[in-house]
């Protein structure tokens, strides 16, 4: 079953998801015959609408396999985390989506009143440090935040080693960073930096100096960060570990740094939209995401850290226990998200 799952990746990665806020598409269908690992699994059918900020290369193989195994037709709507969460909020009276998949769990928590609590059948197999005690969201993968740099633009030995190094004047205008109002991962990065220097005036003083070094360049989406660094548009960028590792694995001349002050490894998650039109199919999809097959796939193919207890360590990368982490305040990140975004926006616009 696993062999069949991973074997379809090469062809699937040729399928491009139409990216952008509110872009809608029918997920790819499989018309090939043969064993897709569904012989012992009943096909219940039905439909499912997903809202997802994930990259196409992550979405496509997982959605396709879910369709093959269940017979459920998936409609994918892609966009940035912030825009899609606002869409869920706007549709609250008459929900159009079923599952919100990915985006930092702290961002999902901030919108928890729009999600339906669900305890996955795989709950006992998940690492407890990543599980939401209230069951509003289900963890998908643990995502350390890193500094990514281009080896052709950054001389050996001059790589930033810390968050504080990002304030060096030599990096002014050369840092790729996404707008935390639009990107869930960027918001997590903002809170990580605040935590490293103090969630009070000291932390915000650091953020003000960091923004000065951005020199007015704030990107509209997280995907533009790692792409911008790899394409030599920026010397360095703040991004997800798994995104940077995909470029490293692909042979790009980039490197990654785990900041010396500590970073975060907040999971991204999936949540069922309250009042979802296809509730049973939504539950099936949540269970599927944290099942052993999908969790093995994301480790092997995407270098994402599994949230399962029985997951094997990913070879060739720093082990989780060896990454210095800040004491990330999840409740602060979720409950103060609107305030933190407004504060950051004032700094960006020069109002503060």
Model-flagged regions — what are they?
Residues 1-47, 309-310, 350-352:
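Short, low-complexity disordered leader/linker segments with a strong preference
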Residues 34, 39, 43-44, 49-75, ...:
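Short, polar/charged alpha-helical segment
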Residues 49-59, 82, 89, 95-233:
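Extracytoplasmic ligand-binding site segments that recognize negatively charged/polar headgroups
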Residues 106-111, 230, 235-253, 302:
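A ligand-binding cleft/hinge motif common to bilobed small-molecule-binding domains
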Residues 146-153, 191-194, 266-278, 297-298:
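A bilobed periplasmic-binding-protein/Venus flytrap-type ligand-binding module shared by bacterial periplasmic
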Residues 207-211, 218-219, 250-274, 309-310:
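Periplasmic-binding protein-like
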Residues 264, 273-328:
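Mature extracytoplasmic/periplasmic domains
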Residues 316-352:
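Extracellular/periplasmic bilobal clamshell ligand-binding domains
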């Amino acid at each position: 079953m696993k062999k069949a799952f991973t074997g379809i990746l090469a062809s699937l990665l040729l399928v491009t998801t139409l990216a952008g806020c509110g872009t809608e598409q029918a997920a790819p269908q499989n018309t090939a015959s043969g064993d897709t690992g569904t012989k012992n699994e009943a096909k219940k059918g039905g439909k499912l609408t997903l809202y997802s900020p994930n990259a196409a290369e992550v979405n496509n193989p997982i959605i396709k396999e879910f369709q093959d195994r269940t017979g459920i037709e998936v409609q994918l709507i892609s966009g940035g985390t912030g825009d899609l969460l606002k869409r869920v909020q706007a549709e609250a009276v008459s929900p159009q989506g079923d599952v919100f998949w990915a985006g930092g769990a702290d961002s999902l928590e901030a919108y928890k009143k729009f999600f339906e609590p669900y305890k996955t059948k795989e709950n006992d197999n998940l690492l407890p440090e990543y599980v939401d005690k209230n069951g509003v969201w289900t963890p998908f993968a643990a995502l350390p935040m890193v500094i990514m740099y281009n080896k052709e633009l950054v001389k050996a030995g001059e790589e930033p080693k810390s968050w504080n190094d990002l304030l060096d004047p030599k990096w002014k205008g050369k840092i790729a960073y996404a707008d935390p109002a639009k990107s869930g991962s960027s918001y997590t990065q903002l809170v990580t930096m605040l935590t490293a220097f103090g969630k009070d005036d000291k932390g915000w003083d650091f953020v003000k100096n960091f923004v000065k070094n951005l020199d007015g360049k704030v990107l509209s989406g997280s995907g533009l960060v790692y792409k911008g660094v790899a394409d030599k548009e920026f010397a360095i960028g703040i991004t997800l570990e798994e995104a940077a590792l995909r470029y490293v694995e692909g042979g790009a001349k980039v490197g990654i740094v785990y900041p010396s002050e500590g970073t975060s490894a907040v999971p991204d998650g999936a949540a069922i939209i309250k009042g979802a039109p296809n509730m049973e199919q939504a539950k099936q999809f949540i269970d599927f995401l944290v099942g052993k097959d999908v969790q093995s796939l994301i480790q092997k193919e995407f270098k994402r850290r599994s949230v399962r207890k029985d997951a094997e360590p990913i070879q060739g990368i720093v082990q989780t226990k060896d990454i210095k982490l800040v004491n990330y305040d999840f409740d602060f990140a979720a409950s103060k998200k609107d305030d933190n975004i407004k504060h950051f926006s004032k700094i960006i616009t020069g109002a503060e």
